[in-house]
């Protein structure tokens, strides 16, 4: 039995999809455990680029079982469209399994996301407007509709009817916008359910059976630790738990069955949307990193905010997620920058702070403490081992590992999976 969790150590977009794809070669089962289609990941497979939002990265390997776990919220329309996108490119999806306990995103969740963000105005949190938060709210309020409900038209109609009474009152009385008729949703979404019915099962059984049989299971996190609803920069976070602990809740696998946690970081830091970002760059270097690294959101297309590597953030991620292995991505993007900086701590009112603050007010007053390192000009995109790297690039990677306290397992020097290099294995 061997299981590995892949988590983002920053604010998402660290390249988890590529690392999951890379590790999928050794895995036999690949599972997602939280989030929804608010998370995009780009994978290059056989020279072709694919953008996925819901389906696990392992889908390109027909011999791997791919699981959408119970902790996810699923937009059935988006899922059907993503399946069609893969089928058009001759990707076999018969290896997909969808949890019957996962919750469903419906049109009123999407509309609620939009009107609530508009209502907040300057206080908006930068949601992707995919209905994720409202769907998780319904789940917590125990009025959510699950995949199992969607497949039973009588149950679906009953729950939909009940929910629309409340949602329409909210739309009309509070937001002063129009609501929905049952007919707007029922038949269309029931049909989506029928299109995915062949994939639906109890995925907790699938995963636990696989582990008990000694198969290698890879859990793929979405977003990143700093977007975790409990451990992230609240309230500028997602509505679920991307940390490794979220695996047990979102997949139905007990904590004793988790063996390795790979933390994925960029060699710098990025963020989409609003919220604190201590090492953010507003200069030509930031623009250079954004353009060279193509730092635009997979889901939204929004330019990502860019900053120096922040070891305070990644140390926090290591602690709350139990990270055992570091995957450092996009090192090549830093090529040509004369002097590089790594944030080693913060300074708050004259005091050095080494742990990430919970208070956004405190964080807003924190100034990064930087360590400067010399850069490199050599092209490193063809490098296949640490020994082939320029001395300064190797020193930069070593310093990141030292400051975060996480041993290096993987490093990446470009977007293609062939530019991903293994330093040590994670699967038994």
Swiss-Prot record:
Swiss-Prot/TrEMBL keywords: Cytoplasm, GTP-binding, Ligase, Magnesium, Metal-binding, Nucleotide-binding, Purine biosynthesis
Binding-site residues, Mg(2+): 13, 40
The organism's place on the tree of life at top rank: Bacteria
Gene: purA
Identification of the protein by name: Adenylosuccinate synthetase
Function: Plays an important role in the de novo pathway of purine nucleotide biosynthesis. Catalyzes the first committed step in the biosynthesis of AMP from IMP.
GO molecular function: adenylosuccinate synthase activity; GTP binding; magnesium ion binding
Catalysed conversion reaction: IMP + L-aspartate + GTP = N(6)-(1,2-dicarboxyethyl)-AMP + GDP + phosphate + 2 H(+)
Cofactors, names only: Mg(2+)
Pathway assigned in UniProt: Purine metabolism; AMP biosynthesis via de novo pathway; AMP from IMP: step 1/2
NCBIfam families: PRK01117.1, purA
Co-factor: note: Binds 1 Mg(2+) ion per subunit.
InterPro entries: Adenylosuccin_syn_GTP-bd, Adenylosuccin_syn_Lys_AS, Adenylosuccinate_synth_dom1, Adenylosuccinate_synth_dom2, Adenylosuccinate_synth_dom3, Adenylosuccinate_synthetase, P-loop_NTPase
Taxonomic source organism: Halalkalibacterium halodurans (strain ATCC BAA-125 / DSM 18197 / FERM 7344 / JCM 9153 / C-125)
């Amino acid at each position: 039995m061997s299981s590995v969790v892949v988590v983002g150590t920053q604010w998402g977009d660290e390249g988890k999809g590529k690392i999951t794809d890379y590790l999928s070669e050794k895995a036999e089962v690949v599972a997602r455990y939280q989030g929804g289609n608010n998370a995009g990941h780009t994978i290059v497979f056989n020279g072709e680029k694919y953008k996925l939002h819901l389906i696990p990265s392992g889908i390109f390997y027909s011999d791997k079982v791919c699981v959408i776990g119970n902790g996810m919220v699923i937009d059935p329309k988006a899922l059907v469209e993503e399946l069609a996108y893969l089928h058009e490119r001759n990707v076999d999806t018969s290896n997909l399994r969808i949890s019957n306990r996962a919750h469903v995103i419906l049109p009123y969740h999407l509309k609620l996301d939009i009107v609530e963000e508009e209502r907040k105005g300057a206080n908006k949190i930068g949601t992707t407007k995919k209905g994720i938060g409202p769907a998780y709210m319904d789940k917590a309020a125990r009025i959510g509709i699950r995949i199992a409900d969607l497949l039973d038209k009588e149950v679906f109609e009953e729950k939909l009817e009940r929910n629309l009474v409340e949602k329409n009152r909210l739309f009309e009385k509070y937001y002063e916008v129009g609501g929905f008729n049952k007919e707007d949703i029922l038949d269309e979404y029931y049909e989506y359910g029928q299109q995915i019915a062949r994939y639906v099962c109890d995925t907790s059984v699938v995963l636990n059976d696989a582990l008990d049989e000694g198969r290698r299971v890879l859990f793929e996190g979405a977003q990143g630790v700093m977007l975790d609803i409990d451990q992230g920069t609240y309230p500028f976070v997602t509505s679920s738990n991307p940390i490794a602990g979220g695996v047990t809740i979102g997949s139905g696998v007990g904590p004793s069955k988790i063996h390795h946690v790979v933390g994925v970081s960029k060699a710098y830091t990025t963020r989409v949307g609003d919220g604190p970002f201590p090492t953010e760059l507003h200069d030509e270097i930031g623009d250079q990193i954004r353009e060279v690294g193509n730092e635009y959101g997979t889901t939204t297309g929004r330019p990502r905010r860019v900053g120096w590597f922040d070891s305070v953030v990644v140390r926090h991620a290591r602690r709350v997620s139990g990270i055992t292995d570091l995957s450092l991505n996009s090192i090549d993007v830093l090529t040509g920058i004369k002097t590089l900086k790594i944030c080693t701590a913060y300074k708050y009112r004259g005091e050095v702070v080494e742990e990430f603050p919970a208070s956004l007010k405190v964080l807003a007053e924190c100034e990064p403490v930087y360590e400067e390192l010399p850069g490199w000009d050599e092209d490193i995109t063809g490098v296949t081992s640490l020994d082939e790297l320029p001395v300064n690039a190797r020193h930069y990677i070593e310093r990141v590992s030292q400051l975060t306290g996480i041993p290096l397992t993987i490093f990446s020097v470009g977007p293609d999976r062939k530019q991903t290099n293994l330093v040590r294995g994670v699967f038994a």
